Amino acid sequence: MGFQMSVMCIGQLAMQAVVNSLGTAAVAGYTAASKADQVSVLVNNAMMTAISNYVAQNFGAGKRERIRQGVRASLLQTETANIMMCIGILLLRNPIVQMFLSNPSSEIYHYSDLFLTIEAPFYFLLGLLAVYRTSIQSMQNGRAPFMACMIELVMRIAATVGLARILGFTAVCIASPMAWFGACVLLIPCYYQMMKKLTFAE
């Protein structure tokens, strides 16, 4: 988890560097939107803690079917929460910004709206990433989550630094969804391959 947080921080630094180059309105809009965005991160982290303990206990007890059932239930709960947060943030994005900024300008609203409108619909990817990565880690596979972290880092930096000249602030908005997608492409097949092997061993 410590390494994952370090990778996340490095990616956030790259995103912040690009935002800083776009002016004060972009910085203010991004900062306010990021605070709202952190709600989703906190909720998904809570789900990660729950599924981590559940999978680890059942993996140790050799209860493969309970792992499968628990992961499915966790996915349902996590994605339900993410859908609700997405809808809430999209409907209340301007009042949310006003909670953190007094009298924000139309330009600040433009940046915060753009960030939340692009990123919020992809919270489901963050949910998939949280559940599958934690489940894999809890089954004593550290390699795949490590590789997923590196994919996240590379894609987040590539999106912000590589596409900033072409897309500007939009590059920052798509960076996290791209990183989540890249990590999911690795982790989801990995989880099901592991479950097949565990079932076969049983």
Which residues make up each language-model segment?
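Hydrophobic faces of transmembrane alpha-helices in multi-pass small-molecule transporters and flippases
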Residues: 1-14, 18-19, 39, 43, ...
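Small-residue-rich hydrophobic transmembrane alpha-helices
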Residues: 29-87, 91-93, 126-140, 144-148
